[in-house]
Amino acid sequence: MRKILRLKVGREDLILETGLLAKQANGAVLATYGGSTVLATVCCSDSVRENLDFVPLSVEYNEKYYAAGKIPGGFIKREGKPKDKEVLVSRLIDRPMRPLFDKRFGREIQVVPTTLSTDQMNPPDIVGMNAAFAAVFLSDIPFNGPIAAVRLAYLNNEFIVNPSFDEIQDSILDIVVAGSLDGITMVEGGANEVSEEVLLSAIDKAYEYIKQICNLQKEFVSIIGEREKLPLAYEEGVFEFKDELKNLIYSELKDACFVKGKLNRDKAIKLVKQKAYEHFSSISQVNEDNEFLFYKAFDDFEREIVRKSILENNLRTDGRTSTQIRDIVAEVDLLKRTHGSSLFTRGETQALAVTTLGTSIDEQIMDDIDGDKRLNFMLHYNFPPFSVGETGRLMTGRREVGHGHLAQRSLEAMLPKKDDFPYTIRVVSEILESNGSSSMATVCSGSMSLMAAGVPVKEQVAGIAMGLISDGDKYVVLSDILGEEDHLGDMDFKVAGTKNGITGFQMDIKISNVTKQLMKDALEQARIGRMHILSIMDSVISRSRDDISVNAPKIVQLQIDIDKISLVIGSTGKTVKAITDEFEVRVQIEQDGRITLFGTDSLKMQKAKAKIESIVREPKIGEIYDGIVKKINSFGAFIELTPIKEGFLSNRARSRDDRYGDMRHSRYGSGRHSRYGRDNRNTFGMNPPRLEEGQIVKVKISDIDKFGKIELELVRD
């Protein structure tokens, strides 16, 4: 049965519809906001897998070109593998939703939001998020919903709910917030040095609308009726000999949890686990049927030890207190041939960042339904398996795309405008070691490599990952969390920024009772930590170098009148090709008359610039040129001043010059009876100099008539 509900959210109505499309799915909702429409479906498999310690969830957001009235570019005219944007939106949907599924369900779950229409004004990603959340909540799959999402921009000191693309572009804050009726579950966004207070206010504002959208979903259920939920695959059991296990391992496990060094600590914990397993196996208390419960009980004890130590003793497994940051070592210029490089090591997390400068030809061309774009800044994050001491495939997964995007948006607000620095910038972060917060290490290393490359960034940027341990009554915010603290803790809050404010952030929360005061404490602690990290980075490099690397391509720019672009290009590109070949430069001409030269030899580039300036320069009386004799006739010679400008040097204007000899040796005859008359000396009063085609002569513009014809005279040295 078709049902439609709507709610005013910002400038438009959010319309949710079910019962018309994709009725064979476990759940399907069509969401519309303005002219953007997304269909979200959810399905689960029939097969059941027991004793899973994770939710087998996949989210596949996809955008159809027909949604914007377009046909895919390229040779293959159909949508292919997911673009980075689709991967990022899939992660936005996945992260707040995943903790609300019951692991005991045991079936694979697939959520597929598909953009069917877009007005290219209202971003379809936020529409897709709400469509997906509603589809799952209305389905027969066990889900602890409802949840909803809202985007905010901050423009002219006002918050805009679900802003347009243009408003996002002009805003100093772009934030997406997701949550349930119990509280916030996810925050992500980028900013241009906003304060912690503005960020907190944005989250508060977004949560007002999140609660309204959640209630809209509940109203949907009350209208169509709550569906009977599918059964769980198994009931969560308890290891029968848990008390015996605790008595056997607790003391030894506690010591193992505080062994220094990630690898040594992991090895010590695994040894305790192995000994315990062998003990219980030997007395037939662990077998294939209950070993899952054994491992779960062991992990519960490890979690209890780590969390209790932090809450009661303010002591973390590596010996730090809650506010301490791991030792930091930073350096630049490790790689001599690259344009800029930096190594940032924080504890056992290490990021090598390399900046490369290219030309506009190297820009990333984005062909998607929001319109074609050209990106002149890219950040690529690589996480090879050796960074955690493992083997595996070298590939770019969703995690790499997501972490790279967070680091990129944390840095891009500090980059110069393209008009001021017309290079294409690519930063590559190689994670060489990892024990938590590698994306924030990428921000730090990337910022320093940009400065080392001579990119005129506005401010240094640093990042830090914050964690949380809470028992409901008491909480402890952790600075610079380890990988295990991310896994065993209640929050992962990454914050990047400058000394002036926040530029990037991402927060995932596993608990529902996160108060505003808690978030305020976390942001303040992150600010203090960020200042500490910035001070260390600034001691290595505090400002961008005055010059770019000698290995980087050089750029020279000039501006010409639009109506003279054709003169520089020449017939069939002849003129610009000649400049390219002669001076070994790459020439880019914009429609507004801006010309950019790319090359490696500064002297040749300046000569190329002078050549172009001479082509477009308007000649003036009195100017002197080194011209080329192009053609000689009975009245004089045509002299090329520029590739597209010629002047005429008449015989009368030629004065005798010993460098050239006289007309008796010219192509026009010899002696007294030449084609100029019986006696040239009688005609002109002196012998005119000899000229030859291709000869270079110094001439001065003596006159320009009303038709633009140029008269020349010879210049003596």
UniProtKB/Swiss-Prot annotation:
Domain named S1 motif: residues: 622-715
Catalytic activity field: RNA(n+1) + phosphate = RNA(n) + a ribonucleoside 5'-diphosphate
Domain of life: Bacteria
Keyword Secreted attributed: no
Pfam families to which the protein is assigned, alphabetical: KH_1, PNPase, RNase_PH, RNase_PH_C, S1
Keyword Glycoprotein among record annotations: no
Enzyme class (EC, first level): transferase
EC nos: 2.7.7.8
Record-level GO cellular component terms: cytosol
GO molecular function, one term: polyribonucleotide nucleotidyltransferase activity
Needed co-factor(s): Mg(2+)
Transmembrane segments: none
Disordered: annotated segments: 659-689
Keywords noted in UniProt: Cytoplasm, Magnesium, Metal-binding, Nucleotidyltransferase, RNA-binding, Transferase
Start and end residues of each KH domain: 553-612
Biological process terms in GO annotation: mRNA catabolic process; RNA processing
Extent of Basic residues compositional bias: 666-675
Subcellular location: Cytoplasm
CDD domains listed in its UniProt record: KH-I_PNPase, RNase_PH_PNPase_1, RNase_PH_PNPase_2
Binding site for Mg(2+): D486, D492
Protein's job: Involved in mRNA degradation. Catalyzes the phosphorolysis of single-stranded polyribonucleotides processively in the 3'- to 5'-direction.
Family as reported in the entry's similarity comment: Belongs to the polyribonucleotide nucleotidyltransferase family.
Protein name (database record): Polyribonucleotide nucleotidyltransferase
Organism expressing this protein natively: Borrelia hermsii (strain HS1 / DAH)
